[in-house]
């Protein structure tokens, strides 16, 4: 039986807990090093080193996703701990469900430091039936139906964690007023990220 770690909120022995402190409140995630080892190592190392401290969510699209992790706040910046872009780590166990922590990229194998949190609350009915026909696992199709998400990003963006606490903070960020390029008018700031291993 395949394990879909996003379908439960308990932190397993092989998962890492992180708490993201923002000026809108806290969000707690569990990360999946078994599924996306390089991606998790990149995020955890950046978090511990303070790379994300003071960095904003520079792109916020309500009912889609909130994106951050770029020190330049332009959407063009951010580097990985590996010195260059690194490869995607797609899995048939992790999906872009509501609350998924996923890597932003500029095409295949272009991961740096930018990430997004999926915030789409409803998957259209016709898309759900396409997922079932398209080979998505039944428990995941059901989760998309119940929780929402962005299934068209599956196998295009590396999912490496899941929001387990702080949904109201995610919603607050998503509902912030934005201007040009979907950039918040008032900065939404990541103050720090605590890693609890």
UniProtKB/Swiss-Prot annotation:
GO molecular-function terms, A-Z: peptidyl-prolyl cis-trans isomerase activity
PROSITE patterns documented for this protein: CSA_PPIASE_1 (PS00170), CSA_PPIASE_2 (PS50072)
Q: What EC number is given for this enzyme?
A: 5.2.1.8
A GO biological-process term? protein folding
SUPFAM superfamilies registered for this protein in UniProt: Cyclophilin-like
InterPro entries from the UniProt entry = Cyclophilin-like_dom_sf (IPR029000), Cyclophilin-type_PPIase (IPR024936), Cyclophilin-type_PPIase_CS (IPR020892), Cyclophilin-type_PPIase_dom (IPR002130), Cyclophilin_A-like (IPR044666)
- Keyword Protein biosynthesis assigned: no
The segment(s) forming the PPIase cyclophilin-type domain are: 14-195
Task: Provide the catalytic activity annotation.
Answer: [protein]-peptidylproline (omega=180) = [protein]-peptidylproline (omega=0)
Asked if the Swiss-Prot or TrEMBL record annotates the protein with the keyword Lipid metabolism, the reply is no
Which UniProt keyword terms apply here?
Answer: Isomerase, Rotamase
PANTHER family attached to this UniProt entry: PEPTIDYL-PROLYL CIS-TRANS ISOMERASE-RELATED (PTHR45625), PEPTIDYLPROLYL ISOMERASE DOMAIN AND WD REPEAT-CONTAINING PROTEIN 1 (PTHR45625:SF4)
| Protein family according to the UniProt entry | Belongs to the cyclophilin-type PPIase family.
The record's function comment reads:
PPIases accelerate the folding of proteins. It catalyzes the cis-trans isomerization of proline imidic peptide bonds in oligopeptides.
* Protein name as annotated: Putative peptidyl-prolyl cis-trans isomerase
């Amino acid at each position: 039986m395949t394990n879909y770690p996003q379908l439960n909120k308990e932190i397993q022995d092989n998962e890492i807990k992180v708490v993201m402190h923002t000026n809108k409140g806290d969000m707690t995630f569990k990360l999946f090093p078994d599924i996306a080892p390089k991606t998790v190592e990149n995020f955890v190392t950046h978090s511990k080193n303070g790379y994300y401290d003071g960095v904003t969510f520079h792109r916020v699209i309500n009912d889609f996703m909130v994106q951050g992790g770029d020190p330049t706040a332009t959407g063009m910046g951010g580097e990985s701990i590996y010195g260059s872009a690194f490869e995607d780590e797609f899995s048939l166990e992790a999906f872009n469900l509501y609350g998924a922590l996923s890597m932003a990229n500029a095409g295949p194998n272009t991961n740096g430091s930018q990430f997004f949190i999926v915030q789409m609350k409803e998957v259209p009915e016709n898309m759900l039936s396409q997922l079932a026909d398209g080979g998505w696992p039944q428990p995941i199709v059901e989760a998309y139906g119940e929780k929402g998400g962005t299934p068209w990003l599956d196998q295009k963006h590396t999912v490496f964690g899941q929001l387990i606490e702080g949904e109201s903070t995610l919603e607050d960020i998503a509902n912030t007023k934005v201007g040009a390029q979907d950039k918040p008018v008032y900065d939404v700031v990541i103050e720090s990220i605590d890693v609890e291993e």
